[in-house]
Amino acid sequence: ALCMVDFLCSVWLAKRLEPDQRGGAILRERNQEVYQAKKEEVMEKCFNCYAENGLMGTGIKALADACGFSKASLYTYFNSLDDLIIESTAYCMAKVEDDFMQKAPTDPADIARFFREVPYWTAKEHGKKYRLMYQIYTHPKYIEHGKKFFQGVSQRYTEYAKQLEPKLGIPYSVLTPLIFIFVRASVHYALFEDEYYLKSQLDILEQAVPLVIEKFKK
């Protein structure tokens, strides 16, 4: 009888604890979401601060001021200044990629407009960020992270090409290198405002793309 009482008590206790345990798990999950959202906000503010003032011209105080809190608070989110630079660059430049590809044409008739407008738009919107990215990823301290980032870029643009394939009627294996040419020309223009280089690349694309579309219509 005593064993049965112990058993019933343990069942009752377990049922009393379950809601609290679930509530604790939910609270931890929410806290983690809040932490991650704040970290992303900090990464954007720090990256923008670096983009405005340069990698070498920006100290920890300037970063903390941009975020609106103390220098020590930065280390709530990052183990070191190097970690902040590495994580912020990867996060913010992936967002730039998304911004860029959100403007990708979904109709063949829109491709010419895309070629004409987007290089100038991204130079205006993202030029400082591109320059900072190259400053960071060509630095000996960060170059391995740059290699890893650009491997990811290649994979992501391939995925974009797969998404565009049914909309444009061009196989992704053909579309991917065309995207690479266009992105490289756009980024080069954003970095150096080299109009001659940009137009020479766009001329090739504007001649090639209609031929490619016509080929795969058949």
What residue spans do the PLM features occupy?
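N-terminal intrinsically disordered/low-complexity leader segments
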Residues: A1-A37, K218
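Helix-turn-helix
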Residues: E41, K45, C49-D83, E87
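Solvent-exposed, amphipathic alpha-helical segments
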Residues: E41, K45-E52, D99, K103, ...
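Hydrophobic alpha-helical connector segments
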Residues: E87, F100-E125, Y172, T176-I179, ...
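Short, basic, alpha-helical segments at the C-terminal edge of helix-turn-helix-like DNA-binding modules
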Residues: A90-E97
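Amphipathic alpha-helical packing segments from all-alpha helical-bundle domains
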Residues: E97, K141-G169, S173-P177, D203, ...
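Short secondary-structure transition hinges
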Residues: Y120-E159, F192
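Amphipathic C-terminal alpha-helical segment
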Residues: W121, Q135, T176-K199, P210-K218
